[in-house]
Amino acid sequence: MELTPREKDKLLIFTAALLAERRKGRGLKLNYPEAVAFISAAIMEGARDGKTVADLMHYGTTLLTRNDVMDGVAEMIPDIQVEATFPDGTKLVTVHHPIV
């Protein structure tokens, strides 16, 4: 199977997000890469489901709280930018202050 670099990146994000979801489910606090992957994957899936950019910008702020991440992680992520595939094409979604 031949994958483009972009497809490989998407699979890597999905894999990291799956690991983060499992760890979160066990009550563990997420580290920086896990938190970014968790939010990014949710944004990409929302785009595939047909949600709007504005909806996803808000949705991204509801996924994790400071209680879900290790100390200092929320401050390390001022915003997350995700290039997501929507039904009408690829768009950049920016989530400001994703961890409240």
From Swiss-Prot:
Gene: ureA
Quaternary structure and interacting proteins, as annotated: Heterotrimer of UreA (gamma), UreB (beta) and UreC (alpha) subunits. Three heterotrimers associate to form the active enzyme.
One Pfam family this sequence matches: Urease_gamma
Alphabetized PANTHER family for the sequence: UREASE
One record GO biological process: urea catabolic process
Pathways involved: Nitrogen metabolism; urea degradation; CO(2) and NH(3) from urea (urease route): step 1/1
Protein name: Urease subunit gamma
Keywords noted in UniProt: Cytoplasm, Hydrolase
Source organism of the structure: Ralstonia pickettii (strain 12J)
EC number: 3.5.1.5
Location of this chain's protein in the cell: Cytoplasm
SUPFAM superfamilies: Urease, gamma-subunit (SSF54111)
CDD domains per the UniProt record, alphabetical: Urease_gamma (cd00390)
Biological classification of the source: Bacteria, Pseudomonadati, Pseudomonadota, Betaproteobacteria, Burkholderiales
Similarity comment text for this entry: Belongs to the urease gamma subunit family.
Catalyses which reaction(s): urea + 2 H2O + H(+) = hydrogencarbonate + 2 NH4(+)
Cellular-component GO terms for this entry: cytoplasm
